[in-house]
Amino acid sequence: MGWVWKDDDEQGGHVNPSAADISPRLDGDRCSTRKVVRTQCKTEEVEPGKFIRKCEKTEEVLRDCVGRPIEVVQSNKEYTEDDVTDQVMKGSVSFGSADNGAFNFPGLQHDIDEIEHNFLGGLSRFFEAAEDMKNGFFSSFGIPHIFDEGPSTSLPSPRREIPIDSPRQLEAFQKAYGTKSGEVDLSGLARDV
């Protein structure tokens, strides 16, 4: 599936021809898309001593829009059959026995890795959005970004420093409190980490 994303500043009437089944939303609603992959497998003994693992893999692209039900944009199903007779006879395929682990199912580790990857990625995006909201909120009141200011720019700096660490802030502190000796009481600025 191919997507061509265009900025809202460009002509809004263009729709990707490969996505003709998707109705264009030009009303400014907040929508997101996500891909859901489900795999269901079962092992069957098709004849005495012969085992086949049958899997059904479903991939769906879903669109979530505020105030609307979830919409299935695309859905694909894939069926596979694998001969697992050797694995079953050797005992390497687990059917939930305690000695091999209750969660030792084929493909489970991959699913767990995908869940972890998606969860941590979503969590980091959440924290980035929360930090952006915090910065926007405090900047609307004119509160300076003590920990985000670099030496010569107003953009956030990846280097975090204590408020008196930069020379510019040290000079401002000395002017405000009339001290030139460098002796500063930092007890009020200490924070738990």
Curated annotation (Swiss-Prot):
It comes from the Eukaryota. Residues 1-27 are annotated as: Disordered. InterPro entries: Fra_a_1-associated (IPR053346). Interacts with FRAA1E, FRAA2 and FRAA3. This is Fra a 1-associated protein. The lineage of its organism: Eukaryota, Viridiplantae, Streptophyta, Embryophyta, Tracheophyta.
